[in-house]
Amino acid sequence: MLINKTKGKVWTGRVKIADTFFKRFRGLMLTPNVNYALVFILPSETRLNASIHMFFMLQSIDVIFLDSSREVVDLKRARPWRFYVPKGGAKYIIETPVGVIDYLNAEIGDEIDWEVEEERSAIPSPVEALNKIGIKNSNGTISLAEPKPKLKGE
């Protein structure tokens, strides 16, 4: 979720974080359908570090450049195969689907924040799986079974 704290507007889409060199390097390149926001956390707040390229991008995106206090220093509608440098130094870059800047009514000077939803794994954790193991057969073989509920008198 992206929040324009200055204007009280909220975009409820998914947000992912790019906080390592490889995540920042990959970015949204070759992503066929950008349907989430990607927040880049940069090592320093400079114009050079915050410059982006749109090589190998399959579609246009909205880009919000923020300083270390999360205030907007520049906004761009970025098109494929272009290079962009923000007007001021940026510590954070938010790449979003086209239209999010308009939806948030974002302008230079606005404070933008975000919340990242915890990604859930489709694979159960080992602890959950162990709770389901029980001895079911009289011959001692182990099989998957729901644990027997304890009665009050036990």
Swiss-Prot record:
Query: Could you identify this protein by its name?
Result: UPF0127 protein TSIB_1463
Q: Which InterPro entries match?
A: DUF192, Saro_0823-like_sf, UPF0127
Q: Which family does it belong to?
A: Belongs to the UPF0127 family.
| Species in which this protein is naturally found | Thermococcus sibiricus (strain DSM 12597 / MM 739)
Query: Which segments does the entry list as coiled coil?
Result: none
